Amino acid sequence: MIKVGIIGATGYVGVELLRLLLNHSQIEIGAISSVSFDGQELNNIYKNFLGRTNLICTNMNEVIEKSDVIFTALPHGLSEDIAKKIIENNKICIDMGADFRLSNEEEYKYWYGNNFSQPELHKQSTYGLPELNKEKIKNSSLIANPGCYPTSIELALAPLLKNSLIEPNGIICDSKSGTTGSGRSLSLNTHFPEENENFAPYKIGEHRHTPEIEEILSNIANTKVTVTFTPHLLPINRGIISTIYCTPKEKIGLNSIHKIYTSFYENEQFVKVLPLGEIASIKNVRLSNNCHISFHLNHRKDQIIIISAIDNMIKGAAGQAIQNMNIILGFKENEGLNLISPAF
Protein backbone atom coordinates (compact mmCIF):
# COMPACT_ATOMS: atom_id res chain seq x y z
CA MET A 1 0.00 0.00 0.00
CA ILE A 2 1.32 3.44 -0.95
CA LYS A 3 1.97 5.70 2.05
CA VAL A 4 1.01 9.36 1.67
CA GLY A 5 2.04 12.28 3.86
CA ILE A 6 1.00 15.92 4.17
CA ILE A 7 3.30 18.72 5.30
CA GLY A 8 1.03 21.57 6.38
CA ALA A 9 -1.97 19.38 7.12
CA THR A 10 -4.06 21.78 9.21
CA GLY A 11 -4.56 24.64 6.77
CA TYR A 12 -7.66 24.57 4.60
CA VAL A 13 -5.92 22.91 1.63
CA GLY A 14 -4.09 20.40 3.82
CA VAL A 15 -7.17 19.35 5.73
CA GLU A 16 -9.19 19.06 2.51
CA LEU A 17 -6.47 16.81 1.11
CA LEU A 18 -6.72 14.63 4.19
CA ARG A 19 -10.52 14.45 4.01
CA LEU A 20 -10.37 13.20 0.42
CA LEU A 21 -7.39 10.89 0.92
CA LEU A 22 -9.14 9.04 3.74
CA ASN A 23 -11.63 7.82 1.10
CA HIS A 24 -8.91 6.70 -1.36
CA SER A 25 -8.79 2.89 -1.61
CA GLN A 26 -5.21 2.60 -2.89
CA ILE A 27 -3.27 4.58 -0.27
CA GLU A 28 -2.95 5.01 3.46
CA ILE A 29 -1.79 8.03 5.43
CA GLY A 30 1.83 7.68 6.54
CA ALA A 31 2.11 10.85 8.63
CA ILE A 32 1.06 14.49 8.75
CA SER A 33 2.77 17.61 10.09
CA SER A 34 1.70 21.06 11.22
CA VAL A 35 3.89 23.80 12.65
CA SER A 36 0.89 25.42 14.34
CA PHE A 37 -0.36 22.21 15.97
CA ASP A 38 2.80 20.13 16.39
CA GLY A 39 2.22 17.15 18.67
CA GLN A 40 -1.56 17.55 18.72
CA GLU A 41 -4.13 14.99 17.64
CA LEU A 42 -6.01 15.96 14.51
CA ASN A 43 -9.34 15.08 16.14
CA ASN A 44 -8.78 17.85 18.66
CA ILE A 45 -8.23 20.41 15.90
CA TYR A 46 -10.96 19.35 13.46
CA LYS A 47 -13.86 17.52 15.08
CA ASN A 48 -15.18 16.31 11.70
CA PHE A 49 -12.45 13.62 11.76
CA LEU A 50 -13.69 12.02 15.00
CA GLY A 51 -13.97 8.27 14.53
CA ARG A 52 -12.10 8.30 11.20
CA THR A 53 -8.47 8.77 12.20
CA ASN A 54 -6.20 9.06 15.22
CA LEU A 55 -3.42 10.89 13.38
CA ILE A 56 -1.11 13.11 15.41
CA CYS A 57 0.71 16.06 13.86
CA THR A 58 4.40 15.20 13.85
CA ASN A 59 7.51 16.80 12.38
CA MET A 60 8.36 17.22 8.72
CA ASN A 61 11.23 14.71 8.75
CA GLU A 62 8.96 11.95 10.02
CA VAL A 63 6.45 12.69 7.26
CA ILE A 64 9.18 12.33 4.62
CA GLU A 65 10.53 9.15 6.24
CA LYS A 66 7.14 7.42 6.51
CA SER A 67 5.65 8.45 3.14
CA ASP A 68 6.12 7.56 -0.54
CA VAL A 69 4.19 10.60 -1.76
CA ILE A 70 4.30 13.92 0.09
CA PHE A 71 1.95 16.84 -0.43
CA THR A 72 3.42 20.18 0.67
CA ALA A 73 0.57 22.54 1.58
CA LEU A 74 2.55 25.58 2.68
CA PRO A 75 2.67 29.34 2.06
CA HIS A 76 4.82 30.42 -0.87
CA GLY A 77 8.55 30.43 -0.29
CA LEU A 78 8.55 27.50 2.14
CA SER A 79 8.33 24.48 -0.18
CA GLU A 80 11.47 24.64 -2.35
CA ASP A 81 14.00 23.49 0.24
CA ILE A 82 11.59 20.86 1.58
CA ALA A 83 10.92 19.60 -1.95
CA LYS A 84 14.65 19.17 -2.47
CA LYS A 85 14.85 16.93 0.59
CA ILE A 86 11.84 14.92 -0.60
CA ILE A 87 13.34 14.39 -4.07
CA GLU A 88 16.75 13.51 -2.60
CA ASN A 89 14.99 10.76 -0.63
CA ASN A 90 13.52 9.40 -3.90
CA LYS A 91 9.99 10.32 -2.89
CA ILE A 92 7.28 12.08 -4.92
CA CYS A 93 6.49 15.70 -4.07
CA ILE A 94 3.25 17.44 -5.03
CA ASP A 95 3.50 21.09 -4.04
CA MET A 96 0.23 22.90 -3.42
CA GLY A 97 1.80 26.36 -3.26
CA ALA A 98 3.26 28.76 -5.80
CA ASP A 99 6.95 27.89 -5.48
CA PHE A 100 7.24 25.85 -8.69
CA ARG A 101 4.41 27.26 -10.82
CA LEU A 102 6.49 29.89 -12.65
CA SER A 103 9.46 28.93 -14.80
CA ASN A 104 10.93 32.44 -15.07
CA GLU A 105 12.90 33.45 -11.97
CA GLU A 106 12.73 37.19 -12.70
CA GLU A 107 8.96 36.97 -13.04
CA TYR A 108 8.77 35.04 -9.79
CA LYS A 109 10.88 37.62 -7.99
CA TYR A 110 8.72 40.47 -9.34
CA TRP A 111 5.48 38.92 -8.07
CA TYR A 112 6.64 37.07 -4.95
CA GLY A 113 9.68 39.09 -3.86
CA ASN A 114 12.13 36.17 -3.75
CA ASN A 115 14.60 34.42 -6.01
CA PHE A 116 14.35 30.67 -6.55
CA SER A 117 16.14 28.99 -3.64
CA GLN A 118 16.52 25.76 -5.66
CA PRO A 119 16.80 26.85 -9.32
CA GLU A 120 17.98 23.41 -10.53
CA LEU A 121 14.90 21.81 -9.02
CA HIS A 122 12.64 23.99 -11.15
CA LYS A 123 13.96 22.24 -14.25
CA GLN A 124 12.57 18.96 -12.89
CA SER A 125 9.13 20.26 -11.93
CA THR A 126 5.99 19.68 -13.98
CA TYR A 127 2.93 21.92 -14.05
CA GLY A 128 0.13 19.71 -12.80
CA LEU A 129 -2.92 20.56 -14.90
CA PRO A 130 -3.82 16.99 -15.92
CA GLU A 131 -6.15 17.81 -18.80
CA LEU A 132 -3.34 19.67 -20.57
CA ASN A 133 -0.15 18.01 -19.30
CA LYS A 134 -0.94 14.37 -18.57
CA GLU A 135 1.98 12.71 -20.35
CA LYS A 136 4.57 14.85 -18.57
CA ILE A 137 2.85 14.32 -15.22
CA LYS A 138 3.09 10.53 -15.62
CA ASN A 139 6.88 10.65 -15.52
CA SER A 140 7.39 13.40 -12.96
CA SER A 141 8.33 13.20 -9.29
CA LEU A 142 7.84 16.93 -8.62
CA ILE A 143 4.48 18.51 -9.40
CA ALA A 144 3.50 22.16 -9.20
CA ASN A 145 -0.21 21.96 -8.45
CA PRO A 146 -1.91 24.88 -10.27
CA GLY A 147 -3.57 27.78 -8.52
CA CYS A 148 -7.35 27.80 -8.16
CA TYR A 149 -8.07 30.82 -10.37
CA PRO A 150 -5.60 29.67 -13.06
CA THR A 151 -7.27 26.24 -13.17
CA SER A 152 -10.68 27.74 -13.91
CA ILE A 153 -9.28 30.14 -16.52
CA GLU A 154 -6.79 27.86 -18.29
CA LEU A 155 -9.32 25.05 -18.77
CA ALA A 156 -11.80 27.56 -20.14
CA LEU A 157 -9.45 29.12 -22.70
CA ALA A 158 -7.26 26.19 -23.76
CA PRO A 159 -9.36 24.89 -26.69
CA LEU A 160 -9.67 28.31 -28.32
CA LEU A 161 -6.02 29.27 -27.84
CA LYS A 162 -4.72 25.85 -28.91
CA ASN A 163 -6.62 26.23 -32.18
CA SER A 164 -5.59 29.91 -32.63
CA LEU A 165 -9.22 30.98 -32.78
CA ILE A 166 -9.03 34.06 -30.54
CA GLU A 167 -6.82 37.11 -30.21
CA PRO A 168 -4.09 36.40 -27.63
CA ASN A 169 -4.22 39.91 -26.18
CA GLY A 170 -7.03 41.82 -24.51
CA ILE A 171 -8.55 38.77 -22.80
CA ILE A 172 -10.55 39.76 -19.73
CA CYS A 173 -10.83 37.27 -16.86
CA ASP A 174 -13.37 38.26 -14.22
CA SER A 175 -13.30 35.70 -11.40
CA LYS A 176 -15.19 35.28 -8.14
CA SER A 177 -14.15 32.98 -5.30
CA GLY A 178 -15.37 31.77 -1.95
CA THR A 179 -13.39 32.90 1.07
CA THR A 180 -11.57 29.59 1.65
CA GLY A 181 -9.28 30.66 -1.19
CA SER A 182 -7.71 33.13 1.24
CA GLY A 183 -6.67 30.34 3.62
CA ARG A 184 -7.28 29.71 7.31
CA SER A 185 -5.27 32.64 8.66
CA LEU A 186 -7.37 35.52 9.91
CA SER A 187 -7.67 38.69 7.82
CA LEU A 188 -9.96 41.70 7.79
CA ASN A 189 -11.26 40.95 4.28
CA THR A 190 -12.58 37.55 5.31
CA HIS A 191 -13.85 38.63 8.74
CA PHE A 192 -17.57 37.75 8.82
CA PRO A 193 -18.98 41.30 9.19
CA GLU A 194 -16.75 42.49 6.33
CA GLU A 195 -17.57 39.68 3.89
CA ASN A 196 -21.18 38.84 4.76
CA GLU A 197 -23.71 40.66 2.53
CA ASN A 198 -20.77 42.04 0.57
CA PHE A 199 -19.13 41.44 -2.79
CA ALA A 200 -15.98 43.24 -3.88
CA PRO A 201 -12.84 42.89 -6.00
CA TYR A 202 -9.39 42.69 -4.43
CA LYS A 203 -5.75 42.90 -5.54
CA ILE A 204 -6.86 44.64 -8.72
CA GLY A 205 -4.15 44.41 -11.35
CA GLU A 206 -1.69 42.82 -8.95
CA HIS A 207 -2.93 39.34 -8.06
CA ARG A 208 -0.10 36.80 -8.05
CA HIS A 209 -2.02 34.31 -10.17
CA THR A 210 -1.72 36.67 -13.16
CA PRO A 211 1.77 35.56 -14.30
CA GLU A 212 0.82 31.90 -13.90
CA ILE A 213 -2.24 32.37 -16.08
CA GLU A 214 -0.28 34.24 -18.75
CA GLU A 215 2.65 31.80 -18.80
CA ILE A 216 0.51 28.68 -19.16
CA LEU A 217 -1.84 30.24 -21.72
CA SER A 218 1.18 31.45 -23.72
CA ASN A 219 2.54 27.90 -23.73
CA ILE A 220 -0.80 26.58 -24.96
CA ALA A 221 -1.11 29.21 -27.69
CA ASN A 222 2.58 29.08 -28.65
CA THR A 223 2.55 32.88 -28.59
CA LYS A 224 2.50 35.52 -25.86
CA VAL A 225 -0.89 35.84 -24.21
CA THR A 226 -1.86 38.74 -21.95
CA VAL A 227 -4.91 38.96 -19.71
CA THR A 228 -6.63 41.45 -17.47
CA PHE A 229 -7.41 39.41 -14.38
CA THR A 230 -9.61 40.74 -11.58
CA PRO A 231 -10.56 38.48 -8.64
CA HIS A 232 -13.50 39.06 -6.31
CA LEU A 233 -14.53 37.59 -2.96
CA LEU A 234 -17.98 36.05 -2.69
CA PRO A 235 -19.71 35.67 0.69
CA ILE A 236 -19.62 31.85 0.37
CA ASN A 237 -17.19 29.23 1.66
CA ARG A 238 -16.10 27.54 -1.55
CA GLY A 239 -16.33 27.74 -5.33
CA ILE A 240 -14.97 29.82 -8.20
CA ILE A 241 -16.78 31.15 -11.21
CA SER A 242 -14.82 32.87 -13.97
CA THR A 243 -16.39 34.94 -16.72
CA ILE A 244 -13.95 35.35 -19.58
CA TYR A 245 -14.26 37.73 -22.51
CA CYS A 246 -12.25 37.19 -25.70
CA THR A 247 -12.31 38.27 -29.34
CA PRO A 248 -12.43 35.71 -32.17
CA LYS A 249 -9.95 36.15 -35.04
CA GLU A 250 -12.72 35.26 -37.47
CA LYS A 251 -16.47 34.99 -37.15
CA ILE A 252 -17.44 31.70 -35.53
CA GLY A 253 -20.77 30.25 -34.40
CA LEU A 254 -21.72 28.61 -31.12
CA ASN A 255 -22.19 25.19 -32.71
CA SER A 256 -18.62 25.26 -34.01
CA ILE A 257 -17.29 26.36 -30.62
CA HIS A 258 -19.24 23.59 -28.90
CA LYS A 259 -17.76 20.95 -31.23
CA ILE A 260 -14.24 22.25 -30.58
CA TYR A 261 -14.69 22.02 -26.80
CA THR A 262 -16.40 18.62 -26.76
CA SER A 263 -13.67 17.21 -29.00
CA PHE A 264 -10.88 18.79 -26.92
CA TYR A 265 -12.20 17.37 -23.64
CA GLU A 266 -13.87 14.17 -24.88
CA ASN A 267 -11.50 11.94 -22.88
CA GLU A 268 -11.39 14.14 -19.77
CA GLN A 269 -13.87 12.94 -17.17
CA PHE A 270 -13.63 15.98 -14.91
CA VAL A 271 -14.32 18.69 -17.51
CA LYS A 272 -17.97 18.95 -18.48
CA VAL A 273 -18.86 21.02 -21.55
CA LEU A 274 -22.45 22.09 -20.99
CA PRO A 275 -25.09 21.98 -23.74
CA LEU A 276 -25.66 25.22 -25.62
CA GLY A 277 -27.97 27.58 -23.76
CA GLU A 278 -26.97 26.35 -20.29
CA ILE A 279 -24.83 28.42 -17.92
CA ALA A 280 -22.11 27.05 -15.65
CA SER A 281 -22.65 27.70 -11.94
CA ILE A 282 -20.84 27.04 -8.67
CA LYS A 283 -23.72 25.06 -7.17
CA ASN A 284 -23.33 22.25 -9.69
CA VAL A 285 -19.60 21.71 -9.08
CA ARG A 286 -19.47 22.33 -5.34
CA LEU A 287 -17.72 19.50 -3.42
CA SER A 288 -16.68 17.80 -6.69
CA ASN A 289 -13.52 17.64 -8.82
CA ASN A 290 -15.44 18.81 -11.88
CA CYS A 291 -15.05 21.90 -14.03
CA HIS A 292 -18.20 23.03 -15.85
CA ILE A 293 -17.75 25.20 -18.94
CA SER A 294 -20.37 27.08 -20.92
CA PHE A 295 -19.93 29.65 -23.68
CA HIS A 296 -21.97 32.40 -25.19
CA LEU A 297 -21.72 34.99 -27.94
CA ASN A 298 -22.14 38.74 -27.69
CA HIS A 299 -23.15 39.31 -31.32
CA ARG A 300 -23.26 43.07 -30.90
CA LYS A 301 -19.57 43.21 -29.98
CA ASP A 302 -18.41 40.08 -31.84
CA GLN A 303 -17.21 38.63 -28.54
CA ILE A 304 -16.99 35.12 -27.08
CA ILE A 305 -17.95 34.84 -23.40
CA ILE A 306 -16.84 31.72 -21.53
CA ILE A 307 -18.13 30.73 -18.09
CA SER A 308 -16.08 28.30 -16.01
CA ALA A 309 -17.04 26.94 -12.58
CA ILE A 310 -15.00 24.82 -10.15
CA ASP A 311 -14.78 24.09 -6.45
CA ASN A 312 -11.68 26.06 -5.45
CA MET A 313 -10.77 23.60 -2.70
CA ILE A 314 -11.13 20.45 -4.83
CA LYS A 315 -10.49 20.92 -8.56
CA GLY A 316 -8.73 24.16 -7.63
CA ALA A 317 -6.50 22.50 -5.02
CA ALA A 318 -6.80 19.15 -3.17
CA GLY A 319 -8.76 17.15 -5.73
CA GLN A 320 -6.49 18.17 -8.57
CA ALA A 321 -3.44 17.21 -6.48
CA ILE A 322 -4.89 13.75 -5.89
CA GLN A 323 -5.68 13.53 -9.61
CA ASN A 324 -1.98 14.21 -10.26
CA MET A 325 -0.96 11.56 -7.74
CA ASN A 326 -3.27 9.02 -9.37
CA ILE A 327 -1.71 9.68 -12.78
CA ILE A 328 1.87 9.32 -11.47
CA LEU A 329 1.11 6.09 -9.61
CA GLY A 330 -0.90 4.53 -12.44
CA PHE A 331 -4.18 4.48 -10.52
CA LYS A 332 -7.51 5.24 -12.12
CA GLU A 333 -7.60 9.01 -12.52
CA ASN A 334 -10.86 9.27 -10.60
CA GLU A 335 -9.76 7.09 -7.67
CA GLY A 336 -10.94 8.85 -4.52
CA LEU A 337 -12.56 11.57 -6.63
CA ASN A 338 -15.92 10.09 -7.62
CA LEU A 339 -17.68 13.00 -5.99
CA ILE A 340 -21.17 14.23 -6.86
CA SER A 341 -22.18 17.77 -5.97
CA PRO A 342 -25.11 17.95 -3.53
CA ALA A 343 -28.36 19.16 -5.08
CA PHE A 344 -28.75 21.86 -2.41
UniProtKB/Swiss-Prot annotation:
EC number: 1.2.1.38
Key words of the record: Amino-acid biosynthesis, Arginine biosynthesis, Cytoplasm, NADP, Oxidoreductase
Principal subcellular localization: cytoplasm
Active site: residue positions: 148
A cellular component term, taken from the record's GO annotations: cytoplasm
Domain of life: Bacteria
Pathway connected to this protein: Amino-acid biosynthesis; L-arginine biosynthesis; N(2)-acetyl-L-ornithine from L-glutamate: step 3/4
UniProt key word Lyase: no
Catalytic activity: N-acetyl-L-glutamate 5-semialdehyde + phosphate + NADP(+) = N-acetyl-L-glutamyl 5-phosphate + NADPH + H(+)
InterPro entries according to UniProt: AGPR_AS, AGPR_type-1, NAD(P)-bd_dom_sf, NAGSA_dehydrogenase, Semialdehyde_DH_NAD-bd
GO molecular function: N-acetyl-gamma-glutamyl-phosphate reductase activity; NAD binding; NADP+ binding
GO terms classed as biological process: L-arginine biosynthetic process
Stated role: Catalyzes the NADPH-dependent reduction of N-acetyl-5-glutamyl phosphate to yield N-acetyl-L-glutamate 5-semialdehyde.
UniProt record similarity statement: Belongs to the NAGSA dehydrogenase family. Type 1 subfamily.
Name of the protein described by the UniProt record: N-acetyl-gamma-glutamyl-phosphate reductase
Species for this entry: Clostridium botulinum (strain Eklund 17B / Type B)
Gene for this chain: argC
